[in-house]
């Protein structure tokens, strides 16, 4: 059964690739490029500290090509760009409470403090190209502009005949803000914000070679650090933000 399923999968990729019309190559040599949406190339080559960054317009990048090469100093990055709120970690308005981490492949981490804020729920699917969710804010007693939750990771899909990956493809969630570092008062105790969840990477590649040092990463962002204020009479123990869930 597994062999049959894998054969069907290979046929689906071949049918997809056979319908593509390759018009140009994308060769980056010590260069940086920002992309979003779907793009088709015959050859994609990233070398000598080259980077493709996925921008926040759609937070998604789909690459169709005959061959892909990424050297050990180069990569494709969709880190901390998504404002998706589908599985957002909950905000918390009490003084000292930490915001919860965004959910995706798993639950986001709960925010710390005397009362925990709940982590974002599991969402998305292994075969669905979705972006990660943002983390919740820490206590929002002052201004909503402070202590934001981390953004979620974006989404990257590569459909290719062959690929050699020595470098990195990542869609990591961003860290939640540390409260005091983002402009909080030094008097009161304040919680950190939740980390964003990791995003999604899909590689539909017939002949894939990955080497020592190569990396596929969809980790969630760390929760923000709380701040214990100077007011000795404040009975609150501040909590850190929850970590974001990993992605797929």
Q: Which stretches of residues belong to each language-model region?
A:
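Boundary at the C-terminal end of the N-terminal hydrophobic targeting segment
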Residues: 21-23
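Bacterial N-terminal signal peptides that target proteins for export
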Residues: 1-13
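Short non-domain terminal segments
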Residues: 4-7, 39, 51, 90
């Amino acid at each position: 059964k597994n062999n049959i399923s894998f054969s069907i999968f290979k046929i689906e990729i071949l049918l997809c690739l056979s319908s593509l019309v390759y018009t140009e190559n994308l060769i980056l040599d010590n260069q940086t490029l920002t992309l979003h949406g779907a793009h088709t190339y015959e050859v994609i080559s990233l070398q000598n500290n080259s980077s493709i960054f996925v921008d926040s317009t759609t937070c998604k990048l789909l690459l169709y090509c005959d061959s892909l090469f990424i050297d050990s100093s180069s990569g494709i990055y969709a880190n901390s760009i998504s404002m998706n709120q589908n599985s957002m970690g909950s905000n918390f308005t009490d003084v000292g409470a930490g915001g919860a981490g965004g959910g995706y492949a798993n639950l986001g981490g709960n925010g710390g403090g005397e009362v925990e804020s709940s982590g974002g729920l599991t969402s998305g699917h292994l075969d669905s190209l979705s972006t990660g969710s943002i983390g919740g804010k820490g206590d929002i007693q002052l201004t909503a502009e402070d202590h934001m939750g981390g953004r979620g990771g974006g989404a990257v899909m590569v459909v290719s005949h062959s690929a050699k990956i020595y470098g990195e493809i990542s869609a990591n969630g961003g860290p939640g803000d540390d409260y005091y570092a983002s402009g909080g008062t030094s008097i009161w105790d304040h919680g950190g914000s939740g980390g964003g969840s990791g995003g999604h990477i899909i590689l539909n590649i017939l002949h894939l070679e990955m080497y020592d040092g190569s990396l596929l990463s969809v980790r969630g962002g760390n929760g923000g650090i709380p701040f214990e204020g100077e007011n000795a009479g404040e009975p609150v123990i501040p909590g850190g933000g929850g970590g974001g869930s990993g992605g797929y």
